[in-house]
């Protein structure tokens, strides 16, 4: 009958236990943030390519893009949230736009919400042509983001398992 002998089995079990305890904080978190950084950088690059238009759009003649101040505000407020666990037990970060720009009006006394401006650019409106910068960026770098996440996760696992 064949037998199997494990040498240093207890040491290996301790490493696996430590990996289990530290997996979320030291492996998953950095890996998810590395992937999100790749995507956020791609969104920023695509946003810089969006044309600006200082005119007023109509349904017959929509503007081709946002005003320069709107675009600058979006570039300045693009960010990544901290990692959170959702109801299904999945860990996520969100990439998005925060705050308000400097274009004030009766409707927006604080300034226009940057999330609203980004959505208007991405989807278009009756007075602005759509410029798909988020969807385009995400589809272009999806594989790169996954590769960055895998590389970071493997590196962190190797550090813990040493």
Model-found features: residue ranges?
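Short, low-complexity, charged/polar segments at coil/turn and helix-coil boundaries
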Residues: 25-123, 155, 161-162
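Exposed alpha-helical structural elements
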Residues: 11-15, 23, 73, 116, ...
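N-terminal, Lys/Arg- and Ser/Thr-rich interaction peptides
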Residues: 1-25
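Lipid-handling modules and contact-site tethers
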Residues: 112-162
């Amino acid at each position: 009958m064949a037998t199997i002998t494990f040498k240093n089995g207890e040491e290996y079990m301790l490493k696996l236990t430590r990996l289990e305890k530290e997996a979320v904080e030291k492996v998953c978190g950095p890996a998810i943030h590395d992937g999100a950084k790749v995507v956020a950088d791609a969104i920023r690059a695509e946003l810089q390519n969006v044309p600006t238009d200082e005119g007023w759009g109509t349904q017959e003649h929509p503007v081709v893009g946002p005003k320069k101040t709107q675009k600058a505000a979006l570039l300045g407020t693009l960010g990544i949230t901290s990692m959170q666990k959702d109801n299904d037990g999945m860990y996520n970060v969100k990439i998005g736009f925060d705050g308000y720009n400097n274009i004030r009006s009766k409707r927006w006394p604080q300034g226009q919400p940057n999330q609203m401006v980004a959505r208007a650019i991405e989807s278009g409106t009756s007075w602005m042509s759509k410029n798909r910068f988020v969807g385009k960026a995400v589809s272009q770098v999806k594989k790169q983001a996954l590769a960055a996440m895998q590389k970071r996760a493997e590196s962190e696992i190797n550090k813990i398992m040493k």
